[in-house]
């Protein structure tokens, strides 16, 4: 199928997970979501990734984000591997891992890239908004573990810009100044941005983070 693009509706599915069967859209409810795939259970990089996700539970909860992982391994394999993750990463996995043995979800989300590996999922990441639309996609090669601090940073930006007429500049972190979007006129700025602003160029106007 065609690759999913930003703004597309995240396809719904039902699947067996380590926490029972889920209907993806119902499971998300009105929260933000991250769906990410890993190549295989009992592999080193994936073990560190899922351990990190578990350690970041409080950070995801603060942002109202639900997380689900996926590979083409079965749920029984996931349960065995979770014991290793908990032991080696000093954590407790507390999110569902989807068993996608029939590759239904992997194909729905274009997570298998034949020129990389014809059988296993790549390291895909999908951030999904409360409207069930895709807000971010990132694909990593099997050799590179994901940076979950960066994913939190992007979620901070997505949630900020969903409710305020700003964008976030390069290397922005929560608390840094933001860019006022071009659609905002200078006349609107005092009402929308009472903290003030600095005009560097007519198209480049900065303001303290509004939230």
Task: List each language-model region with its residue ranges.
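Chalcogenol-based redox active-site neighborhoods
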Residues: 1-211
């Amino acid at each position: 199928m065609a690759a999913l693009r930003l703004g597309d509706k995240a396809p719904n599915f039902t699947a067996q997970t380590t926490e029972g069967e889920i209907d993806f859209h119902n499971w998300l409810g009105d929260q933000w979501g991250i769906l990410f795939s890993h190549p295989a259970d009992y592999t080193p990089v994936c073990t560190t990734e899922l351990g990190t996700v578990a350690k970041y539970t409080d950070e995801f909860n603060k942002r109202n984000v639900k997380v689900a992982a996926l590979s083409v391994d079965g749920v029984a394999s996931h349960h065995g591997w979770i014991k290793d993750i908990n032991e080696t990463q000093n954590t407790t996995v507390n999110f569902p891992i989807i068993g996608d043995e029939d590759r239904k979800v992997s194909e729905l989300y274009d997570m298998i890239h034949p020129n990389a590996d014809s059988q296993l999922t790549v390291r895909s990441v999908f951030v999904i908004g409360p409207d069930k639309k895709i807000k971010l996609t990132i694909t990593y090669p099997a050799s590179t573990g994901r940076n979950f601090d960066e994913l939190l940073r992007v979620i901070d930006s997505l949630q900020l810009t969903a409710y305020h007429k700003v964008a976030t500049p390069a290397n922005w972190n929560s608390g840094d100044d933001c860019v006022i979007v071009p659609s905002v006129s200078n006349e609107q700025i005092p009402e929308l941005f009472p903290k003030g602003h600095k005009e560097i160029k007519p198209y480049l106007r900065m303001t303290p983070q509004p939230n």
